[in-house]
C-alpha cells in the first residue's frame, strides 16, 4: 500500500504544480518521478482522488484536485481563486432561487466550492457548464447570500 500512497501523493503534487490536460501527460510526468503504471491504474487513482477537469486561464481543460486535498500551487493564486476571480459573470435572485452565470466550464468547480462550505443561506447547488442554480434556505435574504458567496467568489459584489 505504501507504493500506492506514494503514487497518489505524486499525482496530487503534479496536478497541483503543473497544468496537466490528459492522462497521457500525467503518465509521462509520473514516469519522470519513477512511477510506472498503466492508464487503467491511473484512471482508478484519479477517480479515488476525486480529480476533475476545469478550464485554466488559457482556456485549456486541466486536472484539478478537490479543495480539501489541494496542495499549494506555484504562484500567488490557487487555481480555485483564479477560477473564481475570472469565471464569475453575474448573480440574480428569484424567490428562494439564485442563479450564477459563469464563463463556459467554470460552473461545476464553483458549485463544488459553494457546496463544500457550511452555509446558513444556501441548501445546495445544481451546476451545468456555465450556470449554477442555488436553492436558498427559508428566510435567506439576497444580501446574506451575496455576503456568503463573496467569501468564495471575491469579485461577486
Curated annotation (Swiss-Prot):
Pathway: Amino-acid biosynthesis; L-arginine biosynthesis [regulation]
GO CC term, one of those recorded: cytoplasm
Pfam families: Arg_repressor, Arg_repressor_C
GO biological process entries: L-arginine biosynthetic process; protein complex oligomerization; regulation of arginine biosynthetic process
GO molecular function: arginine binding; DNA binding; DNA-binding transcription factor activity
UniProt-annotated location(s): Cytoplasm
UniProt keyword annotations, A-Z: Amino-acid biosynthesis, Arginine biosynthesis, Cytoplasm, DNA-binding, Repressor, Transcription, Transcription regulation
Keyword field contains Cell membrane: no
Keyword Cytoplasm among UniProt keywords: yes
Cross-referenced NCBIfam families: argR_whole
PANTHER family: ARGININE REPRESSOR
Function: Regulates arginine biosynthesis genes.
Similarity remark: Belongs to the ArgR family.
Protein name as annotated: Arginine repressor
Amino acid at each position: 500500500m505504501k507504493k500506492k500512497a506514494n503514487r497518489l501523493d505524486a499525482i496530487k503534487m503534479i496536478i497541483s504544480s503543473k497544468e496537466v490536460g490528459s492522462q497521457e501527460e500525467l503518465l509521462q510526468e509520473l514516469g519522470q518521478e519513477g512511477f510506472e503504471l498503466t492508464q487503467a491504474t491511473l484512471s482508478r487513482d484519479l477517480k479515488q482522488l476525486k480529480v476533475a477537469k476545469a478550464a485554466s486561464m488559457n482556456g485549456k481543460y486541466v486536472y484539478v484536485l478537490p479543495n480539501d486535498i489541494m496542495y499549494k500551487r506555484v504562484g500567488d493564486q490557487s487555481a480555485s481563486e483564479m477560477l473564481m476571480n475570472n469565471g464569475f459573470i453575474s448573480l440574480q435572485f428569484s424567490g428562494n432561487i439564485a442563479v450564477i452565470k459563469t464563463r463556459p466550464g467554470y460552473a461545476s468547480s464553483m458549485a463544488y466550492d459553494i457546496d463544500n462550505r457550511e452555509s446558513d443561506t444556501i441548501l445546495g447547488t445544481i451546476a451545468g457548464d456555465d450556470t449554477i442554480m442555488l436553492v436558498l434556505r427559508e428566510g435567506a435574504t439576497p444580501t446574506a447570500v451575496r455576503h456568503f458567496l463573496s467569501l468564495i467568489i471575491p469579485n461577486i459584489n
